[in-house]
Amino acid sequence: MKLSELFNPNEFAARHLSFGDEAALLEALGEKSMDDFVGNTVPQSIRMPSELNLPEALTEADALAKLKGIASKNVINKSYIGLGYYPTRVPNVILRNVLENPGWYTAYTPYQAEIAQGRLEALLNFQQVCIDLTGFPVAGASLLDEATAAAEAMAMAHRVGKVKSESFFVDARVYSQTLDVMKTRAKYFGFELVVGDFAQADEGEYFGALFQYVGKDGDVQDLQDVIGRLKTKGTIVAVAADIMSLVLLKSPAELGADIALGNTQRFSVPMGFGGPHAAYFAFKDEFKRSAPGRIIGVSKDASGKPALRMALSTREQHIRREKATSNICTAQALLANLAGMYAVYHGPEGVKRIANRIHALASTFADALVSDGLNVVHKVFFDTVTVDFGSKEKTDQVFAAALESGYNLRRVNDTQVAAAFHETSTREDLVDLYRAFTGKDAFAFADDVKGRLNAELLRQDDILQHPVFNSYHTEHEMLRYLKKLEDRDLAMNHSMISLGSCTMKLNATAEMLPITWAEFSDIHPYAPEAQTAGYRELLADMENSLKAITGFDAISFQPNSGAQGEYSGMLSIRRYQEANGEGHRNICLIPKSAHGTNPATAAMLGLKVVVVDTDEHGNVNIDDLKAKAEQYRDVLSAIMITYPSTHGVYEEGIRDICRIVHENGGQVYMDGANLNAQIGIMQPAEVGADVLHMNLHKTFCIPHGGGGPGMGPIGLKAHLAPFAPGHVVTDMHNASADQTAVAAAAYGSASILPITWMYLTMMGKQGMEQATRWALLNANYVAKRLSEDYPILYTGKNGRVAHECIVDLRPLKAESGITETDIAKRLMDYGFHAPTVSFPVAGTLMIEPTESESKAELDRFIAALKQIKQEVLKVERGEWPKEDNPLVNAPHTASDVTGEWAHPYSREEAVFPLPFVREHKFWPSVKRVDEVYGDRNLVCSCLPTENYED
C-alpha cells in the first residue's frame, strides 16, 4: 500500500455527495459519463472559460484546526461597549438542544404548518414575550435586526398614518447604526428625516416619530408627555426599546406609543460580531394588516383542535409583489426561538433577577464614582454609566487603563466614556472598572443598592404570566419541553426537503461546530480593530473565494438576508446611476416568472416595475425584452433576472439579455437564488451581470433555521463597488465607506460565516465543481422518473432541467378535483415535506433535490409521488369519493387512526401507504390547518392553559 493514498483530503466531498450512486443515476438518464451529461444539460455558450480558482480541499480535522487558528486571532475582552449589543449567557440546555440541534436548525420556514407545530409554538412563545414586555396585543415572529425594524416602523407609520407630511422625526438618542439604515430607506421613499431633541419632537408636523428607550448613552427619559402631545397631532409613534430594560420599565404601549421595536439579542443570543440576532416588532391591533414580516397565529385543524400557522400572508411579497408591506421573506426564527426559550427557562422571576442585577451593578458603580467626585452624566439610567472627565487626556487614560485590564469601554466623545453593564457582569468587574476609572485599587460596595430608575418609570403590571413561562424551570422539564416541540417538526434530520428555489442541502456537523466558539460568538461588532484580526482574515478568505466563484470584483457581506441582498444590489445600481447624473432612470424590467421579492424590492427603491413576458418554454421572451428595453432606453435602470430561471431552466439567451439591457443604458441585477446550478460551470459576472446576491443559506450550507437566519452578500463589478453599503460606526476599509448602511452591523450576520468557510474549505475546488454537477444530476433523475406519471412543465436543452423541476398537477386537478394542496399534505403521510407549491406557476410543485441527497432517498420520494398519482386515479375512477379519500383528508394523525374510523380506505392506506413508511414514519401532530379561520379570527399570543396540560 501507498502511504499517500491513505490520506484523503477529499473525504468530506464523499460525505456531502453520494459518489456510489453515479453510475446508476447516469444510466437512468442514458448518459455514459458525468461530462457527457453536463454537456447535454448546460448550454456551451454560458460555460466558464477557465477552471474554478479555489484551493484544494482540507479534511474536516485540518479545516477545523485551520479555522481555530484564524479564530484565535480574535481577542475576547470583556465588552462594556453596549450600543445595542451585550454579552449574554446562553443556558446550556438551550444551547445544546436548540442552537446545536439539527432538529431545530435544518427545518425550513413553517409553510407546511401541520409538520411545523413545534417551532410554530416556539415562535408563538417569542411573540408572547414581545407582547408582554411591550404591552401591545400583536407582535411579529422577528425581523432582521433593530435598525431594519426601525426602518420598517417608519414605512409602516407612513402607510397607516393620517398626517399629510413626508417628514419623520428621529430622537437624537437613537443608535447611530439605526439612523444610518433609516437614512438609506428614507431617501427612496421620499421621506425627510429630522433628527433632534426628543422633548421637542412635537414642534414640527411629522407623519411618524421614533424614540430610543433607553438612549444610546444610557439615559432613561419619561417619554409619556411628548408622545401624548404627538398623538394629539395624529403622529404615529414608534419606540425602540431595550428588551432587558422592559422587564423593569413601563411598556411602550403604556407610554402611549403605537409601535415598539428592538433587538432581543440580550435574551441568550451571542453578540457574534453583530449578528445574527432577532429583532422584535409589536404594534396596535389595528395595524396588523400593514405590518412587515411573519406573524404566527392560532387557528384550528380539521378536527377543531387548536393549531398554529403563519397568518395574514396576503401582506407579503410572494403574493402582493410590488404592493407588499415589505420585501422581507423570513427573518431570524432560530434566534427568536433562543430568545423565547430564554424567557421560558428563566420565567418572570428569573428575568427580573437578571435585569435587577444588571441595574444594581450599574447603580453601584455610579454611586462609587460619584462618591469619588467623578461626573456621572445621567442621573437616571438602566445599565449604562456615562462619565464626563472634562478632558481628552483623562478620557484616553481611562480608556487605555480599562483596555489593559481586558475591558472594552465606549468612547462617547473626547471627554466622555461609557460602561454598559450586562448579564455576565460580576462584582469583580466592578472592582476592575473602578480601578480603571479612578486609579484606586478597591472600594467597598454595600449589599443594599438604591437603583437609579425613578418610581414613575417602573412597570407596575405583571409579565410572563402564561403557564409556558412558569412550568419549565428545572433542566429536566426544559429538556423534555424542547424535545416535545422538536418531535412535532419535520426537519432534514428526518427526510429530504425538496423545496424548489430553496436549496435544502446538507448542513454538515463540522460546518456548524465553529459558530459556538467563543472566539467568534463573544466579539462585539464595535470591538477595537486590533481585537478582530480573526474575523477580518475570515472575511478576506470568504471574499476571495466568492470572487473566484462568481467572477465579480468586490463582495459586500452586509446584507443579512436574501431580500436584503436584493435590496443592496439594486441600491448599488441606483447610487451608481445617481452619481453619474442618471438618477432619472427609474424603470426596472422584471420577468413574469420572478419571485415576489424582486418587484417588492424595486418598489422600495422608487423604481417602476415593467413586466417582461416569458415564452411557452418559460424563458424570457427576448423580443418583448428588446422592445421594452428600447421603449424605456432613456429611463431604464435595470433588469432583475434569476439564473437559471425561476422555471429551473438554463436560458440560452442570457448573454443576449444582458447585452440588450446594457445597450439601452441599464444595469443587470442577477438574483442568486439558483446559484447552486452555476458554481464551476459558469460565472455570473462573465455572462454579463453587474451585481449578484448570493444566498449563503442556500448555496453555501448555512442552515435555514426554521425561517432564518440567512446571509445575502452581494458580488459587484468594479464600477458598482463604491456604491455598496457602508457603515457609520465600523471602518470597512473599502470604497463604499461613505455610503449609508442596509443593516445594523457592518458585516451582517458575521458569526455564521464560519459555516460557509468550512464548506468551501472542506469541499475545495474539485468538490465545489462536483457539487454543482450532482445537483443537476439529481434534479434530472427526479424529473426523468416523475415524467412517467406527471408532465414536467419546462425543460431546456435536450429535454433537461437545471437543478430543479416543475411538476404540473393541473391536468390531474381538472380530472379528479384533487388539488396541489391535497398532494402537498398527503406527502406528509409518506414522511416528506412538500416541494414548493404553486410557485412559480399555480397548480404545480417545484422540486429541488440538491446534490447531497442519496439515490435511496430520491427513490423513496419518487415512490411517494408515484403512489400518490395512483391514489388520485382511484378518486378519478370513483373508487374513493371525492369528498372522502386519503388525499383530501391528509395529513392523518395518530389520533385519527386510533379513533373511530368510517372512511372508505383503510387505516393502513392512510398512514402506511408504502412499506418504507413504516421505518420512516413521521406523525403530524395536527390535521389540516384551517387557513381562512386563522386569518378571520387572528390570535397571535400563546394558547390557553388547557393546551399545555399534556
Where are these regions (language model features)?
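Non-catalytic terminal extensions of PLP-dependent enzymes
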Residues: 1-28, 39-80, 89-105, 111-117, ...
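Conserved PLP-enzyme active-site core in the AAT-like
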Residues: 13, 118, 148-307, 369-373, ...
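TRNA-binding/sensing appendages of the translation machinery
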Residues: 31-45, 257-262, 689
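A conserved hydrophobic secondary-structure block that centers on an alpha-helix together
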Residues: 129-150, 164, 168
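General small-molecule cofactor/ligand-binding pocket signal
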Residues: 139, 192-196, 377, 410, ...
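Short glycine-centered, acidic/aromatic-flanked micro-motifs in structured strand/loop junctions
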Residues: 140, 170-172, 211-213, 389, ...
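Conserved phosphate/anionic-ligand binding catalytic regions in large, soluble enzymes, centered on
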Residues: 269-282, 286-287, 331-335, 425, ...
